[in-house]
């Protein structure tokens, strides 16, 4: 039995096949051979095409399969990804614009406005951070500057959520995903709708959130036809690179710190 690991970076997409019994990596692939392009239409902007990530996920899986490994042996899928990127999808699940990724700084002032408007102490108590340049602020930028795009958004999500959607057909996120978007209220242990409300983001645009560790989605028949992964395979892990870093280092208790 094998577990398939997918990592969506900003420079490459890495795919690994892990042997569950031994815990060893049976095969891995990183694509492309050179770095993925990052678009910068203006100074301080950084964008990538979500379809490019998916293309390299498929290429990586096929590269491993070509080495003689059967995707039919895969019994679970885990996804890690570059954090904070904004992916906007229409009702057909198509990206409406390039993803505004983690290193894009266009929404800094919007986040600063929200911090003062909502209240500095309230934000730090409930979201443990400033709205800053995180995903919700990036979406607020789209609302202000690209109203035609904003009007077509059915759901917005993170890079890892998009790959999970392409594998499963289900639009969802995780609680840790909401946290990195500044849409999780740690004080109340629920979604931070006050942030979405401040930004004018309709609640129905936010995908349903589940756990990072546990089955939140399963691969569908389309993924089986395209990649050979059996339909119904659980996507049992999904988290951004920093939660994944903390988990890998066993930084799990209050007061512990993982630095990168």
Segments (PLM) and residue ranges:
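Gly/Ser/Thr-rich active-site cleft segment
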Residues: 8-10, 122-240
């Amino acid at each position: 039995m094998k577990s398939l690991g997918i990592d969506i970076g900003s420079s490459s997409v890495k795919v690994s096949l892990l042997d569950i019994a031994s815990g060893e990596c049976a095969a891995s692939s990183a694509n492309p051979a050179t770095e993925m392009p990052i678009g910068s239409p203006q100074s301080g902007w950084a964008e990538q095409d979500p379809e490019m990530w998916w293309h390299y996920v498929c290429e990586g899986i096929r590269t491993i399969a070509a080495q003689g490994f059967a995707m039919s042996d895969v019994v679970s899928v885990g996804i890690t990804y570059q954090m904070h990127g904004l992916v906007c999808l229409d009702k057909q699940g198509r990206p409406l614009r390039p993803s505004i990724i983690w290193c894009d700084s266009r929404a800094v002032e919007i986040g600063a406005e929200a911090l003062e408007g909502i209240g500095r102490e309230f934000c730090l108590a409930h979201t443990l951070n400033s709205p800053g340049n995180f995903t919700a602020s990036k979406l607020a930028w789209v609302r202000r500057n690209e109203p035609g795009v904003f009007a077509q958004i059915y759901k917005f999500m993170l890079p890892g959520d998009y790959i999970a959607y392409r594998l499963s057909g289900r639009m969802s996120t995780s609680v840790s995903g909401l946290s990195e978007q500044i849409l999780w209220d740690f004080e109340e242990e629920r979604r931070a709708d006050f942030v979405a409300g401040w930004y004018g983001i309709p609640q129905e645009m936010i995908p349903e959130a589940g756990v990072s560790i546990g089955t939140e989605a399963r691969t569908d028949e389309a993924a089986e036809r395209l990649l050979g992964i059996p339909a119904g395979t659980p996507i049992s892990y999904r988290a951004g690179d920093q939660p994944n870093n903390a988990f890998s280092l066993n930084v799990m208790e209050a007061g512990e710190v993982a630095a990168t």
